[in-house]
C-alpha cells in the first residue's frame, strides 16, 4: 500500500499553482455581473509571532467558498495583502531594536510562507502592503479629498493619550477595565491631554451610516453594535439663560415632556463655560473637581453602576417656561463630546439624575405618574403616564401630548428647536508615532493648514534612526528639523502620522488595480468587481475598521470615484478558535508547560497540586498557542484545513484539540488508499450511485450556505460506503474528487492526475450536478443468494415484510433460472439485507 505522502504532494501542487498562476484573475467583460464574485478576508497585520491556528480559520472558509464558486463557473477574485503600518509593527521594532521597515518586511515574508503552506487560492499578483509608497500615496490622496470636502479639520481637544504607546488613541481604541480605562492594544494606562489633532468628520455621515445598514447582509449583532455606537436620538434642544451672564446653556433632551420636573442643570467637566460662570467662592473646588474627572473614561463616567459625582458652581439658570431659578452643577456623568455637553436634571424621571439628586439632596419633583396623582418615588419613574405638578395648560394630559405641546411652545417662543443627536463622535485621526502615513499638510507662519499638491504625493516617510516615541506628545518626526521645515517656502510640515485604520479603510479597492500609478483604481475595474460579495473577519472590528471603511467609501461614492454606496455586501464573523489552558484553585491560569498529566488528571509541576483544564484564548504568556507549521508538518495542510472547518459551525467559538485532527487525517488516508483498488470503468451499482448523488446534494447545499462542518461529515459517511465495494468506480470517484477539492485541494489535484485528467482540476473541471431522481429514498439494496452465492441485487422499500420478500425473490428471473429441477430446503430472510435460498 503506497503511503499518503502529504508533504511531497502539497509542495508539488503549491509549486504548480505558483508556476502556472492558476488563480490569477483578470477582468473579462464577456462574463455577466451575476457570475463575478469578489471574496475578501480581513487582511492580517504582520506580527512577529506569525500565524497561530486560529488565524487561518477565516482564510480557509473563503478559500473553500471561492474554489467551490470557481468550479461552478464563477469569475472569482480572491486577493491578499498586509496591513503593515501601525502600532503592532512599531512596538515590535522598539522592543527588538530593529527598524520597523526591516522588521515589517521580515514578518511579511514569514506570514507569506505560512499562508502559502496552506494552499490558499490567492491571486498573489494583486498583493498589497500598506506601508509601501505606491500604496500610501493613495491613502494620502484620499485624505486630501476628505480635506477638500471639509471633512478633515484641526482641533485642540481633550484626547486619550497613552504614555506607554506614546500616542493619542481614538475613543474606539479605549477599553474599560476594573482598573480604569486602558488602551485596547496592550491594555496600557491612558490619560486625558489637550492636544492639537486632525479629526475626520464622520458625524456628517451618521444618518447614512445608520440607514444603509438595512441594505447589508451582515450579522444582526454587528448591525446593532453599529446602531448603538452611532446612537441616534430625536428630541429637542432647549436654551437656558444664565443669571448675570449673556451666555446660554443649551441642553438636548429626548424627554421634553419632563421639562417641568427640572430641579437642576448639569454641565460636563469639559464645558468651556465653567470658568466663566462659576462664582469665586466655588471656583477652587470646581476646578479641582474638573481636573480629577477629566482623567476618567466616558464609560466609567456614564455607567449606571458607577457612583455619580458633582460640584455646585454657585450659579443659576432660568427655566425657559416658568422662569424659575435652577442651580447649575458640574457632573461627571455628562460628557462634553455628546450632545451639547449639558443635561437638564429631572431626578423624578431619569435614573442617573435620581442617583445624583439623592446623593446631593436636591429637589425631586415628579411631573408624570401612572395614576395622574402624586406618588412616593423609591426610584425614577420612566414610563408613560399622566402629567402632574405642571402649569395648567400642560397638566393632567398624557405625557405624549405634553411632549408635543412643549416642543410647539419652545419653538414658538424661540427657546428651543427640534433636533437629532448622535453618540458618534468625529474620528481622531492623528497619531504621535513614526510608523504610519505622513499627513500631507503644511502650515504657514500663522498656523493655517495648506494641503500638498497631488503631484507632490507621496509625501515619503523619512528614514530615521530614532523612531521611538518622544514621550512629550509629539511625533518622532518632529525631531527631524530638515524635514519639518520647508525652507524655500517658509512652511512647516505636519509631524503626526495617520492611524493604522487609514490603510485598511480602502484596501479592498486597491486590490482591483494594485499596480496603477495614475489613480487609486481604474473606475471600470471598480465597476466590474464592486461591491465585495463576501467579507469574512473578526467581530472585534465592528466599530473600528468596519465603520471607518464604510465612511471613507461613502465619501468616495459622493465624489464619484466608486459605484456602490456600501463596500461589503455580505459579512460573516468567524468564531474564535480557543485552546486548552490550566487553572489553579484560586482561578489563576498557568502556562501549559508548567503542567504535567498523570492518570488523565493535570498537575502544577511547581507544587504538584491538581489543576483544572479550561478553555482560554490563545496567548504567548499561557504558552497555549498552536503553531500551524507544526500541524502541517505532522498532518498536512489539507488535514488542518478540513479539521478547522469540521470543528463546528464557522461562526461558533471552539477549542482546538490536536487529537481531533487525527480523525480527519485518517479520513484523507482512506481516500488516498482507494488508489489500491482497481479503477473500474464499469457501471457502478445502483446504490452507490444513489449515495454519490446524495453526497453531491448535501455538499453543494452546505457549501453554498457555508455549513462546512456538515458537508465534511457527509463526505466522511460517503467514503465509508465507498470502501465497502471491491472496485473503485471511476464514475463515482471522479465527481467525488471534485466535491472534495475545495476542502482538500492538494490531495484532490493529486487524485485528479491519478485518474488521468489534466491539471489543474480547478481549471479543467466543473462542479457535478446531483440528480434527485437517482437518490434512493427509504429503500435498501437486498442481496438475493442461492446457497450463499449472490445471484442478484434489488432495491426494495425498508418496510417490505418477510413473506413479501420471499415472494419477490421467488419471482426474480435470475433466481428462477437457477431453481429449475432443484429442491428448496429452506429460505433464510435477513430483513433489509438478504434472501438466501438453500437448495439441493
From Swiss-Prot:
Its EC number is 6.1.1.4. Keywords: Aminoacyl-tRNA synthetase, ATP-binding, Cytoplasm, Ligase, Nucleotide-binding, Protein biosynthesis. It is an enzyme of class 6 (ligase). GO terms for molecular function: aminoacyl-tRNA deacylase activity; ATP binding; leucine-tRNA ligase activity. Its main location: cytoplasm. One of its GO terms (cellular component) is cytosol. Belongs to the class-I aminoacyl-tRNA synthetase family. This is Leucine--tRNA ligase.
Amino acid at each position: 500500500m503506497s503511503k499518503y505522502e502529504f508533504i511531497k504532494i502539497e509542495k508539488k501542487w503549491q509549486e504548480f499553482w505558483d508556476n502556472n498562476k492558476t488563480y490569477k484573475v483578470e477582468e473579462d467583460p464577456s462574463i455577466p455581473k451575476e457570475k463575478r464574485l469578489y471574496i475578501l478576508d480581513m487582511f492580517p497585520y504582520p506580527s512577529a509571532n506569525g500565524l497561530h491556528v486560529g488565524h487561518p480559520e477565516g482564510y480557509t472558509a473563503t478559500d473553500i467558498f471561492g474554489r467551490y464558486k470557481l468550479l461552478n463557473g464563477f469569475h472569482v477574485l480572491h486577493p491578499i495583502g498586509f496591513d503593515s503600518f501601525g502600532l503592532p509593527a512599531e512596538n515590535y521594532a522598539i522592543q527588538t531594536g530593529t527598524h520597523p521597515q526591516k522588521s515589517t518586511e521580515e514578518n511579511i515574508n514569514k506570514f507569506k510562507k505560512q499562508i502559502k503552506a496552506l494552499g490558499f487560492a490567492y491571486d498573489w499578483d494583486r498583493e498589497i502592503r500598506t506601508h509601501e509608497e505606491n500604496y500610501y500615496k493613495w491613502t494620502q490622496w484620499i485624505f486630501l479629498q476628505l480635506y477638500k470636502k471639509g471633512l478633515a479639520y484641526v482641533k485642540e481637544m481633550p484626547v486619550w493619550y497613552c504614555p506607554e504607546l506614546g500616542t493619542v488613541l481614538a475613543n474606539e481604541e479605549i477599553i474599560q477595565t476594573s482598573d480604569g480605562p486602558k488602551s485596547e492594544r496592550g491594555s496600557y494606562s491612558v490619560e486625558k491631554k489637550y492636544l492639537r489633532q486632525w479629526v475626520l468628520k464622520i458625524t456628517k455621515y451618521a444618518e447614512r451610516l445608520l440607514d444603509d445598514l438595512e441594505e447589508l447582509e451582515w450579522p444582526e449583532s454587528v448591525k446593532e453594535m453599529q446602531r448603538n455606537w452611532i446612537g441616534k436620538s430625536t428630541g429637542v434642544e432647549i436654551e437656558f439663560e444664565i443669571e448675570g451672564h449673556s451666555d446660554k446653556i443649551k441642553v438636548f433632551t429626548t424627554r421634553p415632556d419632563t421639562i417641568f420636573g427640572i430641579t437642576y442643570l448639569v454641565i460636563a467637566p469639559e464645558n468651556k463655560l465653567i470658568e466663566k460662570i462659576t462664582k469665586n467662592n466655588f471656583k477652587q473646588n470646581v476646578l479641582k473637581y474638573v481636573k480629577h474627572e477629566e482623567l476618567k473614561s466616558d464609560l466609567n463616567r456614564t455607567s449606571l453602576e458607577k457612583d455619580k459625582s458633582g460640584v455646585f458652581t454657585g450659579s443659576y439658570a432660568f427655566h425657559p417656561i416658568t422662569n424659575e431659578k435652577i442651580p447649575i452643577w458640574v457632573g461627571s456623568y455628562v460628557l462634553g463630546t455628546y450632545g451639547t455637553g449639558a443635561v437638564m436634571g429631572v431626578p423624578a424621571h431619569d435614573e442617573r439624575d435620581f442617583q445624583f439628586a439623592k446623593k446631593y439632596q436636591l429637589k425631586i419633583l415628579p411631573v408624570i405618574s401612572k395614576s395622574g396623582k402624586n406618588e412616593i418615588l423609591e426610584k425614577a419613574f420612566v414610563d408613560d403616564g399622566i402629567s402632574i405638578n405642571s402649569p395648567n395648560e400642560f397638566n393632567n394630559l398624557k405625557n405624549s401630548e405634553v411632549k408635543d405641546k412643549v416642543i410647539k411652545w419652545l419653538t414658538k417662543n424661540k427657546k428651543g428647536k427640534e433636533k437629532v443627536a448622535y453618540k458618534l463622535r468625529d474620528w481622531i485621526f492623528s497619531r504621535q508615532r513614526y510608523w504610519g502615513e505622513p499627513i500631507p499638510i503644511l502650515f504657514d507662519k500663522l498656523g493655517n493648514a495648506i494641503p500638498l499638491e497631488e503631484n507632490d504625493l507621496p509625501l515619503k516617510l523619512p528614514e530615521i534612526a530614532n523612531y521611538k516615541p518622544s514621550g512629550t506628545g509629539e511625533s518622532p518626526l518632529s525631531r527631524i528639523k530638515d524635514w519639518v521645515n520647508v525652507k524655500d517656502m517658509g512652511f512647516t510640515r505636519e509631524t503626526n502620522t495617520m492611524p493604522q485604520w487609514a490603510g485598511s479603510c480602502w484596501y479592498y479597492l486597491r486590490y482591483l488595480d494594485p499596480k496603477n500609478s495614475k489613480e487609486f483604481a481604474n473606475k471600470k475595474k471598480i465597476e466590474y468587481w464592486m461591491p465585495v460579495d463576501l467579507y469574512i473577519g473578526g467581530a472585534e472590528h465592528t466599530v473600528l475598521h468596519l465603520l471607518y471603511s464604510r465612511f471613507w467609501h461613502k465619501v468616495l461614492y459622493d465624489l464619484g470615484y466608486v459605484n456602490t454606496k456600501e463596500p461589503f455586501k455580505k459579512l460573516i464573523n468567524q468564531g474564535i478558535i480557543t485552546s486548552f489552558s490550566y487553572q489553579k484553585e484560586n482561578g489563576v491560569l498557568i502556562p501549559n508547560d508548567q503542567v504535567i498529566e498523570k492518570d488523565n488528571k493535570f498537575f502544577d509541576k511547581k507544587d504538584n497540586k491538581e489543576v483544572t483544564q479550561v478553555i482560554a484564548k490563545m496567548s504567548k504568556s499561557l504558552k497555549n498557542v498552536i503553531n500551524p507549521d507544526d500541524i502541517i508538518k505532522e498532518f498536512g495542510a489539507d488535514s488542518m484545513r478540513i479539521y478547522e472547518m469540521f470543528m463546528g459551525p464557522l461562526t461558533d467559538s471552539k477549542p482546538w484539540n490536536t487529537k481531533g485532527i487525527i480523525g480527519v487525517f485518517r479520513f484523507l488516508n482512506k481516500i488516498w488508499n482507494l488508489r489500491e483498488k482497481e479503477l473500474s470503468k464499469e457501471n457502478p451499482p445502483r446504490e452507490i450511485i444513489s449515495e454519490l448523488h446524495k453526497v453531491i446534494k448535501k455538499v453543494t447545499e452546505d457549501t453554498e450556505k457555508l455549513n462546512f462542518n456538515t458537508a465534511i461529515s457527509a463526505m466522511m459517511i460517503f467514503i465509508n460506503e465507498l470502501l465497502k465495494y471491491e472496485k473503485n468506480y471511476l464514475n463515482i470517484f471522479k465527481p467525488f474528487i471534485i466535491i472534495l477539492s475545495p476542502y482538500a485541494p492538494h490531495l484532490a489535484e493529486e487524485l485528479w492526475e491519478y485518474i488521468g485528467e489534466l491539471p489543474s482540476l480547478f481549471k479543467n473541471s466543473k462542479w457535478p450536478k446531483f440528480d434527485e431522481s437517482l437518490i434512493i429514498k427509504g429503500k435498501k439494496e437486498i442481496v438475493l443468494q442461492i446457497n450463499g452465492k449472490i445471484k442478484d441485487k434489488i432495491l426494495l422499500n425498508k418496510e417490505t415484510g418477510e413473506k413479501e420478500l420471499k415472494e419477490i425473490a421467488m419471482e426474480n428471473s435470475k433466481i428462477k433460472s437457477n431453481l429449475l429441477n432443484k429442491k428448496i430446503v429452506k429460505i433464510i430472510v435477513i430483513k433489509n439485507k438478504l434472501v438466501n435460498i438453500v437448495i439441493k
